[in-house]
Curated annotation (Swiss-Prot):
GO terms for biological process: cobalamin biosynthetic process. The chain crosses the membrane at residues 34-54, 59-79, 113-133, 138-158, 194-214. It catalyses: alpha-ribazole + adenosylcob(III)inamide-GDP = adenosylcob(III)alamin + GMP + H(+); alpha-ribazole 5'-phosphate + adenosylcob(III)inamide-GDP = adenosylcob(III)alamin 5'-phosphate + GMP + H(+). It is an enzyme of class 2 (transferase). Signal peptide: none annotated. HAMAP family: CobS (MF_00719). It is found in: Cell inner membrane. Pathway: Cofactor biosynthesis; adenosylcobalamin biosynthesis; adenosylcobalamin from cob(II)yrinate a,c-diamide: step 7/7. Belongs to the CobS family. It comes from the Bacteria. GO terms for molecular function: adenosylcobinamide-GDP ribazoletransferase activity; cobalamin 5'-phosphate synthase activity. This is Adenosylcobinamide-GDP ribazoletransferase.
Amino acid sequence: MSKLFWAMLSFITRLPVPRRWSQGLDFEHYSRGIITFPLIGLLLGAISGLVFMVLQAWCGVPLAALFSVLVLALMTGGFHLDGLADTCDGVFSARSRDRMLEIMRDSRLGTHGGLALIFVVLAKILVLSELALRGEPILASLAAACAVSRGIAALLMYRHRYAREEGLGNVFIGKIDGRQTCVTLGLAAIFAAVLLPGMHGVAAMVVTMVAIFILGQLLKRTLGGQTGDTLGAAIELGELVFLLALL
């Protein structure tokens, strides 16, 4: 299990992980790593939350929120934000399915992708600022949001098909079973309940699950399945929806 965790940490983040810690794990077994997603999200959110807490006393709430969002993006290498931008460029192009998938593969940033990035990043900064001004625990909120959003991404993997012939998303999409999905969602729910007691966290998770499930169905209808880009989009939007649900 430890090798699986370190392999997933190096796969979906840019945090430095010694290669020997995940040696011996075949790439074809990476799908089992879905159950570590909430824990990885917990770690990322906690680091981002600590950045907020340290900077808040020095430069105030808005700048602390800005830098916490920036640190979160840097830790993932902008991986999920890139998926969000590519997904929006493709889906909102209003072209054929095949053309949408081609656009999503294009490394150039389009208008819709740029607008999506601006909206999501600004929305996160504003929501974090508002939560802080209301006295909500930012470290716990960010840790829970990142854990839940990555856990809920399993909803776009279980019983979904990969929309392309090959790609990184093919490691997970359509490869996880019901037990893995339930364990992943269960871990995310536990983290949300412990970090944000009084059912506040669980209620926010339910709202996020509904939103991401609907998103998954819309993407399935539009693209014929899911891709690594749509998983990234789901994680980014999941974080935002969870934080909004805490307001």
